[in-house]
Amino acid sequence: MEQRRSGRQKCSKGGEKLIRISQLKLPITHTKAQLEKKIAKTLKNPGNSFTYEIKKQSLDCRHKNDKIFVYTVDVTIRDEQKLAKKVNNNNIMLTKEKPYEFPSPGETPLLHSPVIVGSGPAGLFCGWYLAKAGYCPIILERGEEAEKRQKTVENFWKNGVLDPESNVQFGEGGAGTFSDGKLNTLVKDPYGRNHEVLKRFVAAGAPEEIIYQQKPHLGTDVLVGIVEKMRHEIEEMGGKFCFRSKVTDLIVENNTLKEIEINNDKRIPAQVCVLAPGHSARDTFEMLQKRGVYMEPKSFAVGLRIEHPQEMINMDLYGEPENELLGAASYKVTHKCANGRGVYSFCMCPGGYVVNASSEPGRLAVNGMSYQARDSRNANSAMIVTVTPEDFPDKGVLGGVEFQRDLEKKAWELGEGKIPVQLFGDFCKNQASEALGEVTPCMKGEYILTNVRSVLPKAVGDSIEEGVRAFGKRISGFDREDALLSGIESRTSSPVRIVRDQELTANMAGIYPCGEGAGYAGGITSAAMDGIKVAETVCRKYAAIKNN
C-alpha cells in the first residue's frame, strides 16, 4: 500500500474515478500503517493493493481523554465501482477527481504586457498564472522585496521608524505576510481554484500537510520564502517585478485605459491593468475616485486584540496545558449583543504576537502574527464589531477610510506612537491600566499601558465588553481581569469595493479590480483564488504575448 503524496495528482483527461471514505477515526497518536489498515478494513479489502490521498484531516476534542483525528481519504483501487456497491457503508462513495484547468488564450491582440498593481496573494497568483500562459506580466509593487521588507518592518518594530511605502501592509507578499498565514477559506469554488492555490503553495515550499489540514497555516517565516520562490518562478517564465513602484495615476481616454503613471513620474503603456492594491491602499482609492472609477462603501469591522496565556487556551480545548502532537490550540467565537451588533474573534493567532501594523504617519493599527512554530507564550485574536456605511453617513464612498483613519489617529495620540494596552478589568471600568497582571504582552513594537477604550465608539466598546464576558462562559478564563486588550484593529478588510461587471472589469475598459483591496476576498486563500479568476478572464480574451 502506498500513500500518494497529497500535493500530487494522477488524473486522466476526464478525471480519475476514486472511492471516497469519510469519517475514518483514529487516535491522535496513530501511525501511517494504522491509517492504511483502517482503510483496508473499511473497504473489506485486506489483500488488494491501493493508493490513497488524504483529502481532509480534522481534530475532534470533544472527549478530552480520547482525542481523535477524523479523516476523509480518496482511494484508488481496481474495480472501484464493484467494490463500492459491495460495501454497505454510508461513509463510502464513488467520486471523480477533476483537475483544475486554466483556459486557453483568446484572440484579441495584446500590444503591451498586462500590468498587475500589487504583489499580495491576488497579484502574485494572477501574475504566476499569466506568466505561465505566456503573457509576460509586469507586477508593480509600492513596497520592497520580501527579504528587504522584513528588515524594514523589524527596524520599525525596534526603533519606531515607519516607512509609509514598505511596512506590515505594503510590500511583496501583501499584508498577509505578517499574519498567522491562515489558508482556510469559506469560499466554495466548483472549479478547483482553492485546491490549486494550496498546491501552488506546496510547490513553492509550504508543508504538504496544508493540502488536507482543517485549519492550515504557514506563518510569517515560511511565507517570506514562499513569495520569493513564486517571484523567481514568475521572472523565469517572462514576468517582471518593479519594486518601490507606486501607481499614482491612470491615464484614460474615451473610457479606456491607455497608460499607468508610477511614482508621479514615469508612465508606461497599458491595455490591461489588474488592480490588486490591498485593503490599506487608501491613497490609491483616492486616486481612483478622482479618475471616476466606480467604487462603493462596504461594511468592515473594527475592534481590539485580546491576549491570553496559550496554556489557558490549550487547557480549554485539549484538557492539558501542552500537546506536542497538536501544537497550540485555537478558537473561534461569536456573540450577538443586546445592542443588535455582532462581536466575533478574527485572525486568531495561536502562540502568536500582537504587532504594530501601521502604514501611515501619525496613525496606529495593530494586527496578529504567528511564526510557523506558533510557540510564543500567548494566544491572541481580534475582538471585532461590524460597522456599516450607516455608521459614517454623509461621508461618501471613502467614508470608511475616514472612519478608520480617525480611530487610528486617536490610537496613535493615546499611545504616543506606541501600542495602547489595557487590562480587561480596567477596560470594563473605563479606566487606564497602571500595572500588568499575570498576562504579559507578546508584542512586536513598543507598548504603553493606558485606557484604550477611550478610542472606541461607545457601541463598539460596549459590544466588546459584552462579547468577552459571553466568551468567558465558553472558554474558561477568557474574561479574566488581566487579559490584555490592545488596539486599534482597523484593517480587517477593505472599506470599499471597486465595482466590476460580469467580465470582472471596472467601468473603464482594461481595468480589472482584484483581491481583498478591491473588495472581492477576505484572507490569503480567497485573494489568491480571485487572482487566478482574473487571470483566467484576461486569458480568455487576449492572445498570449509570447505567441504574438
Where are these regions (language model features)?
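Short, Lys/Arg-enriched N-terminal segments with co-localized hydrophobic residues
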Residues: 4-17
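Residues forming the flavin
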Residues: 16-69, 73-548
